[in-house]
UniProtKB/Swiss-Prot annotation:
GO function term, MF aspect, one: 3'-tRNA processing endoribonuclease activity
Organism, scientific name: Methanosarcina acetivorans (strain ATCC 35395 / DSM 2834 / JCM 12185 / C2A)
Role of this protein: Zinc phosphodiesterase, which displays some tRNA 3'-processing endonuclease activity. Probably involved in tRNA maturation, by removing a 3'-trailer from precursor tRNA.
Protein name (Swiss-Prot/TrEMBL): Ribonuclease Z
UniProt key word Iron: no
Cofactor list: Zn(2+)
EC number: 3.1.26.11
Organism phylogeny: Archaea, Methanobacteriati, Methanobacteriota, Stenosarchaea group, Methanomicrobia
Binding site for Zn(2+) 1: H61, H63, H138, D208
Length: 305
């Protein structure tokens, strides 16, 4: 399972229907939160994502609309009896902010919280995946992130295994797990009976940024790109000045990168009643695009074989 829940899709100002930035990724039951704007914990409750399985928070930058939800969330999890440690990753300043988060409210946490500062190119290793930090272009030190699953084993060739003398049963399982087995007086290796490794899935989260090279390169052939799409193209000058992106700019990046699906988020409050200008400008360039809405969910399937 790889499920994306958009908890907050608004721009710098929250609106009546958009919370500040927060995206939850549920990968095989492990929860990872990318940014955590004000009110994120309530959005988690509304979306029924759960929170106690949250392993890590990846902060793109320390503008208030991307991190103010963290203190309340960590307090709630403490009240609910959390014991597992929580990791907070982000750019320069993350350790200092983490200590501040722990001090707010004057309560004793029942679990450990660790802050780790990342630089572009740094990799956080998980079980079956990595998260790579990307250099982005915003008005303060900022990072994007690429979640990259490890390749999956190729398909098991039962007929070939039998032909090599391996009897059906436990030895099949060992081969599928990558272990050589002995059968008929000889060693049979996994590569003899397993097909070509199959690619895992890749999700890229830009955070707030201008269109930039690092996000483009990380997004090549990605399954999903979640990108700052704050403005319609008519606001191009202001987007450049404020270090955000327009829908058309992001669509062009997605097209060049060959992504499978594009989701625009961090939608400016000027589009509270109508996101059609953003959608129209992006679809001129790239068809498979969605303007995110709060509590929207996406399931990311494996690629067809």
């Amino acid at each position: 399972m790889l499920r994306i829940t958009f908890l907050g899709t608004g721009g710098s100002l929250p609106t009546r229907n958009r919370n500040p930035s927060a995206v939850m990724i549920n990968r095989e039951g492990e929860l990872m939160l990318f940014d955590c704007g004000e009110g994120t914990q309530q959005q988690m409750m509304r979306a029924k994502t759960g929170m106690m399985s949250l392993s890590s928070i990846f902060v793109s930058h320390f503008h208030a609309d991307h991190f103010l939800g963290i203190p309340g969330l960590i307090q709630t999890m403490s009240f609910m009896g959390r014991k597992d440690p929580l990791m907070i990753y982000g750019p320069a300043g993350t350790r200092e902010f983490t200590e501040l988060f722990k001090a707010l409210g004057y309560f004793n946490l029942k679990y450990e919280i660790h802050g780790m500062e990342l630089k572009p190119g740094d990799v956080v290793e998980g079980e079956g995946y990595v998260v790579r930090a990307l250099e982005t272009e915003h008005s303060t030190p900022s990072l994007g992130y690429a979640l990259i699953e490890n390749p999956r084993p190729g398909r098991f060739n039962r007929e070939k295994a039998v032909a090599l003398g391996v009897p059906p049963g436990p030895l099949f399982s060992k081969l599928q797990k990558g272990n050589p087995v002995e059968a008929g007086g000889k060693v049979v290796r996994p590569e003899e009976v397993m097909g070509t490794p199959r690619p895992g899935r890749t999700i890229v989260y830009s955070g707030d940024t201008r269109p930039c090279e690092a996000v483009l390169e990380a997004s090549r052939d990605a399954d999903l790109l979640i990108h700052d799409g704050s403005f319609a193209d008519e606001m191009a000058e202001w987007a450049e000045e404020s270090m955000h992106s327009t829908a058309g700019e992001v669509a062009a990046l997605a097209k060049e990168a060959g992504v499978r699906k594009l989701v625009l988020t961090h939608i400016s409050s000027r589009y509270t009643d109508d996101v059609e200008p953003i959608l129209k400008d992006s679809k001129k360039v790239f068809e498979n695009v969605i303007v995110a809405e709060d509590l929207m969910e996406l399931e990311i399937p494996y690629r067809p074989e």
